[in-house]
């Protein structure tokens, strides 16, 4: 008869279940927020429709400002949900490393890079969206020299972009070496195809929408098998 699951295995798989649930909830909240903001801005927001035919940059900036500010609110929410999911997955992979250290010690540590990189990219993205209206308003026309405020805003934007790029690189390393590799190895350890598919789909556009569902179902099936050893 197969060995019963250890407490660490049960704990790790339970955290994988919660990882999938949190990602699904975050995805739903994110889509609702995006559609709500676009609907409010372009259907009910009067600023854009009231712009004169030859609107100045300041007028365009004032009209688009609320859109950029509202859209920037999605970033902290998305990053916060993503970080919570990453923390849960990190704890789950760390539990699994107590059962099989060679397979899971590296992925759970690389998950830390994913969290750090996501936080850096999220903060930078928030600053970029908030700075865009001011840059539009201060952008020079053909008849005047750029102001010092414009150069200052551009400098801040470039710095935020650099930090976002660094954060994105760290997040990518963590995503591949931490989340994808970790989920794949859990699927390989327990011969669960859905977990391995979920790991692959994480990085594929459009298919990544299905990844949390595959991880959730796969972890549930593995946990069920371990709790009822044959």
Per-segment meaning from a language model:
Residues 161-172:
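Extracellular-loop-to-transmembrane junctions of the mid-late helices
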Residues 1-155, 171-230:
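Membrane-interface extramembranous regions at the lipid-water interface
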């Amino acid at each position: 008869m197969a060995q019963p699951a250890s407490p660490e295995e049960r704990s790790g798989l339970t955290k994988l279940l919660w990882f999938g649930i949190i990602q699904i909830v975050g995805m739903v909240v994110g889509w609702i927020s995006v559609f709500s903001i676009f609907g409010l801005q372009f259907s009910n927001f009067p600023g854009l429709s009231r712009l004169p035919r030859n609107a100045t940059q300041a007028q365009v900036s004032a009209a688009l400002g609320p859109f950029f500010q509202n859209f920037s609110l999605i970033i902290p929410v998305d990053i916060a949900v993503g970080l919570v999911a990453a923390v849960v997955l990190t704890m789950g992979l760390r539990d699994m490393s107590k059962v099989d250290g060679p397979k899971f010690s590296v992925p759970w540590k690389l998950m830390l890079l994913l969290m750090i990189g996501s936080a850096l990219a999220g903060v930078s993205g928030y600053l970029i969206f908030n700075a865009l209206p001011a840059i539009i308003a201060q952008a020079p026309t053909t008849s005047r020299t750029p102001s010092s405020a414009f150069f200052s805003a551009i400098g801040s934007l470039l710095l935020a972009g650099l930090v976002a790029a660094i954060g994105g690189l760290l997040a990518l390393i963590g995503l591949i070496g931490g989340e994808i590799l970790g989920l794949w190895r859990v699927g390989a350890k327990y011969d669960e195809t859905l977990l391995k598919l979920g790991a692959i789909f994480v990085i594929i556009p459009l298919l990544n929408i299905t990844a949390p569902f595959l991880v959730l179902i796969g972890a549930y099936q593995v946990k069920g098998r371990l709790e009822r050893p044959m």
